Amino acid sequence: MSLVALYTGSFDPLTLGHMDVIGNAAVLCDEVIVAIGVNPSKTPLFTAQERITLIESACGPLFASHACKLSVRLFSGLAVEAAREAGAQLLVRGLRDGSDLDFEMQMASMNRVMAPDIQTIFFPAAPAVRHITATLVRQVATMGGDASPFVPPVVAAALAQKTSLPS
């Protein structure tokens, strides 16, 4: 039986922190599914299709070096239902600090009640990426700052193009 992990998020944009979690999951699992949550009441910077393309492009080299399959998909609703539909046994989450731990433990407990057969595993963020959030990256980029230290190169290029002001 292969071990399949589901990693959910908005990934708007994909950050080096997300890449850290995906890389850790790739070491342990046979397949990692990156599931982009779609919330019709929010207006993301990148469209769902753009995020899929960026994740596939950024993660391609990582998965080429591991014996692990990557897939990217959209989902709406509960993460445990998305995991069940995808055949994933694991939900993977990253932890940057204590506030992440508090929130993620509550979510893991709720998910465990709803889906006892699906486990949640946590990866502590590497110190180099602990401070990165997609919200802050969007703010830096939309205010004309250089977001490249916080995102994969393909995402930095897309951010620069998306947020460039017309001359």
UniProtKB/Swiss-Prot annotation:
Protein name: Phosphopantetheine adenylyltransferase
Cofactor: Mg(2+)
GO cellular component, one term: cytoplasm
Source organism of the structure: Beijerinckia indica subsp. indica (strain ATCC 9039 / DSM 1715 / NCIMB 8712)
Cell compartments where the protein resides: Cytoplasm
Enzyme class: transferase
EC number, UniProt record: 2.7.7.3
Subunit structure, as described in the record: Homohexamer.
Name of the coding gene: coaD
Pathway involvement of the protein, from the record: Cofactor biosynthesis; coenzyme A biosynthesis; CoA from (R)-pantothenate: step 4/5
Predominant location: cytoplasm
Site (Transition state stabilizer): 18
